[in-house]
A protein has these predicted regions:
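N-terminal export signals
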Residues: 5-21
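C-terminal active-site subregion of NodB/CE4 polysaccharide deacetylases
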Residues: 20-22, 29-133, 140-142, 178, ...
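Residue-level marker for buried hydrophobic side chains located in beta-strands
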Residues: 133-134, 187
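Acidic (Asp/Glu)-rich catalytic clusters
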Residues: 147-152, 172-188
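Glycine-enriched alpha-helix->loop->beta-strand junction motifs that scaffold or abut catalytic
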Residues: 153-155, 183-184, 245-248
Length: 288
């Protein structure tokens, strides 16, 4: 794939080693007389240790950042009151299904967020034409519309809910997050209440960055290591707080990745519902 800068509109505001040794062994030979047993054969192979993978340099991570990442928001039909901008990021269910079919017909294989980050950081293998599907904000339609279609296609995806809205009407519940997680989907954080991270001060860092990770970890029973920035906006100060909070990687939208910390500024594009199949495939090839 060839890289080029792709500027995407920001998201709509929402109301969230192990070591393996080859041990020496001794095999005894039984005797029926008083003569001493023959010497026991002993393995001469030295113990082996499986070293943990070595993280790539920032330059290596940037060079691997050619996997397309798509960002979706609400999955529902448009309404008369929807603004022109809202219509660019609200995907009708029929269009969503057509987009998934295009991805399949194009030979792409959706991967998990963890698999993509492993590839970027360590160079682990991915399918021939990988793509990452992400869903921001925590809308209930991610479960009611998105999950069944993803399951029907056999696709994996990553969901980034804001934690303030969990359990509220029309938003994802904790039980639904657990079900998505058990199905092999990735769950990441999207702040507490969708504040821009480039405007956070003081205790807001704890509320918006640290606490959502802790809550999602508690809900799922395992660490949550990924996050997505509301509106796709980030700052140098935010990168330090994201690292300190324990996140492994973070996703923005269309800006260039930070050359020093590319894992914390992974790019995504938002496919508008007006894109037909060829346009979607062309952008998967050209935008990364």
């Amino acid at each position: 794939m060839r890289r080029r800068q792709f500027l995407a509109a920001a998201a709509a505001a929402a109301l969230a080693g192990c070591s393996r040794g080859t041990a020496s062994f001794t095999r005894s030979v039984g005797t029926t007389s008083g003569s001493p047993p023959p010497p026991s054969p002993t393995s001469s192979a030295p113990p082996t240790t499986s070293a943990p993978p070595t993280p790539g340099t920032a330059q290596e991570i940037l060079a691997r950042s050619t996997v397309p990442v798509l960002c979706f928001h609400q999955l529902r039909d448009h309404r008369p009151e929807d603004s022109d901008y809202a219509r660019t990021i609200i995907t009708p269910p029929s269009v969503f299904t057509a987009q998934l079919q295009t991805i399949r017909d194009g030979g792409y294989t959706p991967v998990t967020g963890e698999a993509l980050v492993d590839h970027l950081e360590f160079g682990t293998a991915l399918p021939a034409k990988p793509v990452l599907l992400t869903f921001d904000d925590g809308w209930g339609t991610h479960y009611s519309v998105g999950f069944p279609e993803l399951t029907r296609f056999g696709f994996k995806a990553t969901f980034f809910p804001q934690t303030m809205v969990l359990g509220a009407q029309n938003w994802l519940s904790e039980d639904q997050l657990r079900e998505l997680d058990r199905a092999g989907m990735t769950i990441g954080a999207h702040t507490f209440d969708h504040k821009r991270v480039d405007r956070l001060v003081g205790d807001q860092w704890r509320v918006e960055i640290d606490e959502p990770r802790a809550r999602l970890t508690g809900i799922l029973g395992h660490p949550v290591d990924l996050m997505a920035y509301p509106y796709g906006v980030w700052s140098q100060e935010a990168l330090g707080h994201v690292t300190a909070a324990g996140y492994r990687a973070a996703f923005q939208l269309g800006d260039a990745q930070d050359p020093a910390q590319p894992l914390l500024t992974i790019r995504r594009i938002m496919p508008p519902p007006t894109w037909d199949g060829p346009t979607l495939l062309a952008n998967l090839e050209s935008a990364f």
